[in-house]
Amino acid sequence: MALAQTEEIARRLNAVAPDIDVEIVKFETTGDSDQTSKLLQHGGKGGAFVAEIRKAIISGELHAAMHSLKDMPGNEDTPGLVIGATLARDPPGDVLVLRSGVSIDDLRRSRGRGFKIGTNAVRRAAYARRLFSEVEVIHYRGAADTRVRKLDNSEMQRLPDGGAVGPADALIMARSGLERVGLANRIAYEFSIEEMLPAVGQGIVAVECAINDWQTRRILWMIDDLASHRSADAEREVLWVLNGHCNSPIAGFSTIQGTQMSLTASVLDEAGGLFIQASRSGPANRPRELGRAVGLELLAKGAAEIIERSRPR
């Protein structure tokens, strides 16, 4: 999936700057090679998928790198780097993929009792427990098509201690991820934004480069989607204000209508029982101010305590 996204960026760069030679460099990070450990053991998504690539940009090995924005940590300073471009946002919602013989009505009627839902995202796990109070959420990793194959074949998910969990009855996944690997037909149910607020930046592809590499920044600016970039700035400002870490069930999503932006963000505990949310609107050309206001409102409602309780010990 990451390769397909990178190839799309290369096509767009060649379209706006046909004289440049775009070389795609494949990186296998710790998060790619280790498909059994929880991402938290590699420093969260930032440590697993982003940190090694960032080092390559800073060293000059790469001019730029593609990231799924939701995988980029938003609570840490990244001196020397900048998001040079974001692509137009893909559908940001989360969906349910079910094994044969299971329906969404089965889950709702039973409140999830006797069912196992697979995900590796703490936000999705918290929302799953909130929506289906008696469900068992199991650690489930792998590429989108690999996870669906495991579901269909009733395969167990290996754990780093040598054990295993599963098999899963359902998976919660990103709609855009399934679409990219041609598995949109497996979507059994799409959660509304009200039911399951997306992760900050979900559906946005970002291109990061060195902050002082003005030639690369100028080229990336030519493929930048302004609305997507403003949404990224607003949502990531919430993460910065909350100092949310990789194990924090934090969600955030913004929309733009004309000159106005609306932003909603939430913080949950891992069990899904504690839930706080804040929503505000403001000028679309001042996204960070809006994100800061929403983040401060969440802090006033007690977000810091929930986040601290979820912090790894």
Write out the residue ranges for each language-model feature.
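Small-molecule-sensing regulatory modules
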Residues: 1-36, 40-43, 50, 68-72, ...
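A conserved helix-loop-strand patch within extracytoplasmic ligand-binding domains
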Residues: 69-73, 78-134
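Short gly/ser-rich anion-binding loops that grip negatively charged ligand groups
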Residues: 43-47, 55, 86
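Structured loop/turn residues at beta-strand edges in well-structured enzyme cores
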Residues: 60, 79, 166
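Glycine-rich, N-terminal phosphate-binding loop and its surrounding beta-alpha-beta segment
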Residues: 48-68
